[in-house]
Amino acid sequence: MYGIEYTTVLTFLISIILLNYILKSLTSAMDFIIYRFLLLIVIVSPFVKTQNYGINLPITGSMDTAYANSSQLDTFLTSTLCLYYPAEASTQIGDTEWKNTLSQLFLTKGWPTGSVYFKEYTDIASFSIDPQLYCDYNVVLMKYDSTLKLDMSELADLILNEWLCNPMDITLYYYQQTDEANKWIAMGQSCTIKVCPLNTQTLGIGCTTTNTATFEEVAASEKLVITDVVDGVNHKLDVTTTTCTIRNCRKLGPRENVAIIQVGGSEVLDITADPTTAPQTERMMRINWKKWWQVFYTVVDYINQIVQVMSKRSRSLNSAAFYYRV
């Protein structure tokens, strides 16, 4: 009997010793693999050029200097550029091969053929409804028109910034703006917006909630409207919903893959006076206008300087995406 017990104890001790040996061997092997892997990363990392993207996070910050990233020096090798221009440009040029000519000129600046896209829009009003900013870098040419200064500034505010938006049901609810970053943005073929501010008893202030004719009109027959009312006050709205969609939006910060070039005009449109524009800089510039060929030549000549004050983005903007998450 004692022999059996001794044998059991001996077997148990041998098992422990063997297990200990196996664990030590595995630990040594894993250490060897991990160290080799880390050494490989250290050796290879200087030769790898990558760029990190956040998960649906807004990028904010000053545009005084270019954002440094490991692929910045070779931007044109891995990026796309969209150049938006009014229809009158192609009409004035009158050359069916003008885009091919510009593509060859962009090639001299380091942008391969096929990386630059030319996007035509009819006018500022129609462009504001559906911007479609799909490229890594988007440059919008807007010819100055003194009668459209407000439309131009609203479009600039829309596409140069990121907005987080939600639907509004104006038939059931009252709405209020909480702070300066909170705006109501309407888009459509024809947007007429009227508001009626309410007191704490939900009675109209200077208006009757049951009579829209008494509401204050803040926009009439516009395609893009960014409405700002008194913060902290409930409002009842009347909107031409058959031809217009309105959303409750919050400005998150600058959209840094978009730049606007104002063509002509005595001064550059300024949107930095808005207290929600932070930092107080903008990617807007002006070039003299004589002929559209001269405009495009200037853009080609300075395209790399323009891109250096922008930041490549992985998210696009169109009218549908804008409404929910820009």
Swiss-Prot record:
N-glycosylated. Some rotavirus strains are neuraminidase-sensitive and require sialic acid to attach to the cell surface. Some rotavirus strains are integrin-dependent. Some rotavirus strains depend on ganglioside for their entry into the host cell. Hsp70 also seems to be involved in the entry of some strains. Calcium-binding protein that interacts with rotavirus cell receptors once the initial attachment by VP4 has been achieved. Rotavirus attachment and entry into the host cell probably involves multiple sequential contacts between the outer capsid proteins VP4 and VP7, and the cell receptors. Following entry into the host cell, low intracellular or intravesicular Ca(2+) concentration probably causes the calcium-stabilized VP7 trimers to dissociate from the virion. This step is probably necessary for the membrane-disrupting entry step and the release of VP4, which is locked onto the virion by VP7. Residues 1-50 form the signal peptide. Ca(2+) 2 binds at residues 177, 228-229, 231, 301. This is Outer capsid glycoprotein VP7. Keywords: Calcium, Capsid protein, Disulfide bond, Glycoprotein, Host endoplasmic reticulum, Host-virus interaction, Metal-binding, Outer capsid protein, Signal, T=13 icosahedral capsid protein, Virion. One of its GO terms (molecular function) is metal ion binding. Glycans are attached at residue 69. GO terms for cellular component: host cell endoplasmic reticulum lumen; T=13 icosahedral viral capsid; viral outer capsid. Residues 165-167 are annotated as: CNP motif. Residues 237-239 are annotated as: LVD motif. The keyword NAD does not apply. Disulfide bonds join 82-135, 165-249, 191-244, 196-207.
